[in-house]
């Protein structure tokens, strides 16, 4: 079994941002040399998420609205007693799911027609890393 690890680095311009990363993950899979296996993608931060969905601007807006309705930015989170102001970012990360595992077939991500990989940042404007680990056979 082969293992290959790389890191993606992001510094979003906004506090909350959805970044399409399918091409970057696909390139890491290609460089890995793995022909059949799994690709694990996970932010190394607890206020971000990686998810799979459609690359359609209306849907992305709907997801952002839904997350804000379920975990609105507000001052009364108990987490804020620590001096932080990002309680909503922690909850949004949980709602969207923290990481994803993707199938690799024939040396490529084996995604459905409309499936795309996204990095979701909820407490941005600083340097963040995402680990991409590819496991499988050559």
Regions inferred by a protein language model and the residue ranges of each:
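Active-site histidine-anchored catalytic micro-motif
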Residues: 1-138
